[in-house]
Amino acid sequence: NSWLRARWFANDAADRITRVMEGAAATDPMIAQVKMSEAMADLMIGMTFCESPLVASGPTATDTQNLEQAVANFGEAIAAAKAANNSEFELASVAGLAQAHLLLGNYAAAAAEAAKVPAGFSYDAVFNEEDRNWVVLVTTKGFNEAAGLMYKWWPKIDRTTTQSSYMRDPLTDEPDPRMPVYFDGEVATDNETPHYSQYKYALENADIPMLHSDGMRLIEAEAKYRTGDYAGMTTILNTLRAAVGLTAFATPTDDATAQSYLLNERFAEHFMEGRRRNDLHRFGLMKSVFAALNGGAGDSERPASGRPTKFSMSDSEPTYNPNINNDLTQRCLPKT
C-alpha cells in the first residue's frame, strides 16, 4: 500500500542524502524530513492495520510492533530536526511521538510529549491541482457526492439553501463550528439517498491536518481520563470548546459519561481527519455503536457482530513478499 511505499522511499532517501552529502547530511533539514516521514508511515500503518512488515520484504509484524517502531523512528527524527535547527519537523515528530504513545497505551508518555506542542501548530497533508483531495471529490457538495455523512448524524444537521451550516453539538445542541456540513435536500449520486455533505474541506486542493495542537490537547485530556481525573479532563475539553464559542459542560462523575464526553470532543476536533474508526477500536465500542443504529434495531447492511475493527494487510503484500505466507487464513482480522 501507499504507506509501505512511503516508508521505503523515506528510508531510501535518507540513505541517498547521507551518501551524497556525507557529514553535512547530519544537520540538513532533508534528513529530518525523511526520518519524520518514515516514522509517520509507521504510525499510520500501526493505527490502521493489524499487521504489516516492519521493513521492505520483511516478515509480518503486529500493529503494536509497528507503533513501537514509530516511537523509535520519531525519536531519531526529533534528534535530526534538532541538529538541523528545524522547528517544524521537530514539532511534527514530537506530535507524532505523542500519538504513537497514545495508541500504545503509554498515556503518561503521550501526554508529556503532547504538552511540548504549542497552540496553533499544525502539520498537514498537502494537496494541489495535480494531487487533489479525494475526501472533497467524493463526499462534498458541488463535487461527485458519492458518499456523505451517515444517517446517524442527520438529525443534528439543519437544512440550508444559502450557505453551509454546522453539525449541532450533542451536549448543548449548539452549532459546532468544528464540524461544517451542508445539506440542501439534494440526493446523492444514487438518486435516492439524501446527501449530507461534510464541508470542512470545500476545495479540491484543501489541506488536511495530520497532527495539530488541538489533537495534542485531546491526548492530554485522555491521559487525565485514563487516571480517573475527570475534572482535569473537563478543564482541557472545555478550553477547546470555549475557543469555538460552545458552552462548557459540567465535570462528569462516572466513567461512562466521561468517556462519552471525551469521544464527543475527539469526534468534533478530528472531524474528517480519519480518527473515529481507531477510537472505536481502542475503546472497544465498535459493536455497541453499530448495534445502536436505527434506534437500537441495528442495520443489516452495517452489522454490529463480526465487524472488522482494523484492516488486515493489503492483498498485494503477501502476494509479492516471499517472507509472508500468502494464505488468507493466516491474516489477522480483529472483529467485534
Predicted regions and their residues:
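Short coil/turn linking the two alpha-helices of tandem helical-hairpin repeats
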Residues: 44-54, 85, 103-106, 228-229
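Conserved, well-structured interaction surfaces
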Residues: 1-48, 76-84, 204-211, 239
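Hydrophobic-face positions in mid-chain alpha helices that act as interaction patches
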Residues: 67, 105, 109-214, 259, ...
